[in-house]
Amino acid sequence: MDTLIRIKRCALAGRLRLTEKARDELELDDLDITDIRESLVNAVAIYKTIRSRNPRTGRREHLHIIQSPNLAGIAIYTKGKLVIVSGVETYYLLVSSKRCS
């Protein structure tokens, strides 16, 4: 299944998790989880997928970067990964900002 569709399904089902850093960035940018959900659902493409290494486990992972507006038209940048939590696919957000470049 297409990765963007999987991410959108997680957003629609409320299966989004945020790191503490992402929560802080949301607060600084005066955004909330609804803005992120709207941005992910509105996305037409994944801007970039990068390979990374998890600093805690050392395992390789794919991080998906999405740049898309929410329903108010605010351009939002997100970086996250799809993970399985208790047998359910969840989108784990590492970074979130309304500053798209």
Tell where the protein language model's regions lie, with residue ranges.
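Ribonuclease/tRNase effector modules and their secretory precursors
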Residues: 1-101
